[in-house]
Amino acid sequence: MLKSGLVYSIGSANQFSFERGIRRFCFNCKIHTFDGTVGNPKVPTALRGLSFHSWNIASEPSNGSKVISKSPKETLAEVHGTPNVTLEVLKMDCEGCEFEVLPRLLELAPSKQVLVEIHRKKSFAALRGLLRFMRSHGYLIFHKERNSWGEPHSAVEYAFISIAHAYRVFRKELCGKAFTTAADE
């Protein structure tokens, strides 16, 4: 169980099962859900304290379109007053924006875990580039499964973990307090 933390959920389609699961696991986590495609979000009362933002996080901000988009840096500055935050979990299902947004967001706000649905809207070279980015920035895949909705192989769910975070958890949980340093806390 987590005592507290910061969680980002990008793309909700007005469904909050992910946020419910996080709330059961971490009652004091601050959860921010972003979705500019939902006009009137129906946030369940059990998720009080969840912050819903009616905008999309995009590689470039939008000015005149119907859907408001903000860059990762604008988002972090507006929500937290600073772009210097660390996320416990980043969940992304943004129908193709992951190729541009995920690298920019992780460079500004590293996350201990990343759950992302990767869509086949780009080439395999783009997918390979995104996976290389994740590895070069210290993330390993710990789970992967095909999303069975829609066209075959059109989306794959990936779960990444920060190598540094996994190491800290391993030392703390499996080796005990005797091997835990202040940096592990």
Residue ranges and their predicted role:
Residues 1-185:
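Phosphate/nucleotide-binding beta-alpha loop and adjacent structural elements of enzyme active sites
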